[in-house]
A protein has these predicted regions:
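Partner-binding and oligomerization surfaces adjacent to conserved cores of proteins
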Residues: 1-255
Length: 255
């Protein structure tokens, strides 16, 4: 089972409509959903930055012969700008991720079984998964050249367009699922296997999440600071609703 993690914020942060982002994120869990934004919905303004000067020069110099290649290139880039991106981390104990994405350790992290998550999203014919890959971290932006276009190397081009980030982000250990469409999608609830609570998450919010997700057989952990160190570790905490009726909604068989 391959695991990956999605960090979510704590209470107190509102969206543009004045609604609680914390309650929104819990509601998507309750409803067995996730949201896929385009690259422009991600937090790094340099998402999708790449170099194509050499390619553009080729188009200019060989304009008489390169029309079809340029047309194909523009078609690729238009498509990639609109794909759905689900960003996850391979790490549940990175203090920077807890600080940035989980409201200073007051939020939570969702543990996914990536295999089940991929299966359930592929089962959704509208989602249409394209690829999954680890983000590559570089000091310089990736380059697009004529060999990639001529070879119709969609995977390699997609990685350079939406799978490469500055080396400053390497601590995130990011893995991305890329889909043809964007928006809210239903998933198999079994794809969520555990919830990790930030070390500063109030007990009331922990109870709120457990009550909302009762009956799903989830494991729960709370992050704690290891004495006399900068490290954090996850300690399992008891489910407060162990005898709740078993949750069975939208359980999918992929056989």
């Amino acid at each position: 089972m391959t695991k990956a993690y999605k960090y979510r914020g704590g209470r107190g942060i509102l969206d543009k409509d004045g609604k609680s982002i914390f309650e929104r994120d819990v509601a998507t869990l309750v409803n067995n959903q996730l949201y896929l934004p385009t690259k422009d919905g991600l937090n790094d303004p340099t998402e999708g930055v790449y170099g194509d000067d050499a390619l553009r020069m080729f188009f200019k110099v060989f304009s008489k012969y390169s029309h079809n290649v340029e047309e194909q290139y523009n078609k690729f880039t238009d498509k990639f700008r609109n794909v759905g991106v689900y960003s996850l981390s391979k790490s549940f104990d990175n203090e920077l991720l807890w600080a940035y994405y989980a409201s200073g350790h007051t939020g939570f992290a969702i543990e996914y079984d990536i295999d089940i998550l991929e299966q359930s999203l592929n089962y959704n014919t509208y989602a249409k998964q394209l690829y999954k890959f680890d983000v590559e971290y570089l000091n310089d932006v990736p380059q697009i050249d004529i060999s990639i276009i001529r070879g119709n190397e969609i995977v390699e081009m997609l990685k350079r367009f939406i799978g490469t980030k500055s080396s400053s982000w390497a601590h995130e250990k990011e893995v991305r699922l890329i889909f043809e469409n964007t928006g809210l999608f239903e998933i198999d609830f079994k794809a969520v296997t555990a919830i990790y609570f930030g070390c500063r998450m109030p007990d009331g919010d922990i109870n709120y999440i457990m009550e909302k997700l009762k009956g799903r057989g989830l494991k729960y952990f709370k992050m704690v600071n290891v004495n006399n160190s900068y490290r954090f570790e996850a300690k399992e905490v008891e489910d407060k609703y162990p005898n709740a009726p078993k949750f069975v909604a939208n359980c999918v068989s992929y056989d």
